[in-house]
């Protein structure tokens, strides 16, 4: 992100007393392995892709199901812009995080995929930091299918539909 002088500063991961700071929630959370992955990936989204905290959210309810298993929560959701987020538009990217010790299985993709479908996102990411896989959500099929692609758009591409379409055609 940029500081007040407009200089680039890397986002810091803050950990103390077994808690980790979650900038998207503006609070300290219990330091669980999955939470550490979540905050580290948020840092990557800011530092490497140029997204801002104001266009992301954490643990957001994406399904409208009131069934027994509780509502589905997406770990990290990214909108094209802060304005889109504030207008409650559909997000661009849904990220599902697993603890580093957890091997990601196909079932996990489908769980996250459901979240991405419910949210009407174009991209779905699953990460445990050691392994990050990126998929495009192929819409118009039931169930939506997963096609693995090379990368998600960065913040400049995200707000440009032509660029997004290019990535979706990878």
Regions found by a protein language model. Give the residues of each.
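A short, conserved, highly charged catalytic patch centered on acidic carboxylates
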Residues: 6-123, 130-170
